[in-house]
């Protein structure tokens, strides 16, 4: 018991000492360095393929979780941006859903078939938000978000820069009060994203097996016939 008390005292003393240390002024410098790295990496960003897991978590009023897994594709050619999410499993059950954003139009199909696809032409104004963490430069982020640097964390063995983002557009921040992303800044890609949607709901996106600047499948941005 004495040993346990001694450990607690040492730990508490360490916390007090840390609290008394002057705050590091490096956060702003660290953020500037991260954004500069993203600016550099974004210039060389063309394509990304990644396996993903999207978890929708609800804590209120009734706890619930939905998990979707599949493959995501991103492509940036000059000012043109395309992305697609092909869902293969929904709550561990086989699925064939697909979401495709191209030429400013978002299309979705619950069956993955072209004939069942629905189009949303107003999605183009949110293009810069869809680029979040995949080819977006530091300038792109600063233009749309108020950014706070939260340090680094290991994600799947990779040292990731953690950023907290609050949208400058009130229409966005009303629906998504806060976004936290973990970035591999050397490649301008996200390893993890957490969207706080308020009212007890959040979405967590995990990305693995990330391949950058390699040819994409010919059907990456197409539905099945």
Protein language model annotation of sequence segments:
Residues 2-12, 21-22:
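Bacterial N-terminal signal peptides that target proteins for export
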Residues 53-57, 77, 88-90, 102-106, ...:
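Solvent-exposed coil/turn segments that connect beta secondary-structure elements
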Residues 30-33, 138-150, 205:
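A short, amphipathic edge element
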Residues 31-109:
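N-terminal mature ectodomain segment of secretory-pathway/periplasmic proteins
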Residues 22-28:
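Sec/Tat signal peptide C-region and signal peptidase I cleavage site
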Residues 106-134:
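Acidic/charged, solvent-exposed loop-and-adjacent secondary-structure segments enriched in E/D, K/R, S/T
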């Amino acid at each position: 018991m004495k040993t346990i008390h001694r450990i607690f005292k040492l730990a508490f003393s360490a916390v007090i000492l840390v609290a008394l240390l002057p705050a590091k002024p490096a956060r702003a410098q660290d953020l500037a360095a991260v954004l500069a790295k993203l600016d550099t990496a974004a210039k060389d960003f063309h394509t990304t393929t990644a396996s993903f897991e999207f978890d929708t978590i609800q804590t209120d009023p009734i706890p619930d979780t939905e998990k979707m897994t599949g493959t995501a594709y991103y492509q940036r050619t000059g000012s043109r941006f395309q992305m697609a999410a092909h869902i293969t499993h929904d709550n561990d059950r086989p699925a064939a859903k697909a979401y495709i954003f191209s030429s400013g139009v978002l299309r979705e199909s619950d069956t993955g078939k072209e004939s069942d696809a629905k189009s949303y032409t107003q999605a183009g104004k949110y293009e810069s938000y869809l680029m979040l963490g995949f080819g977006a430069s530091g300038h792109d982020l600063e233009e749309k978000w108020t950014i706070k640097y939260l340090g680094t964390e290991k994600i799947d063995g990779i040292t990731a820069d953690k950023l907290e983002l609050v949208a400058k557009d009130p229409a966005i921040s009303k629906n998504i009060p806060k976004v936290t992303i973990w970035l591999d800044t050397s490649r301008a890609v996200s390893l993890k994203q957490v969207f706080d949607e308020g009212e007890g709901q959040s979405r967590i996106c995990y990305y693995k097996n990330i391949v950058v600047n390699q040819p994409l499948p010919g059907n990456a941005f197409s539905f099945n016939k």
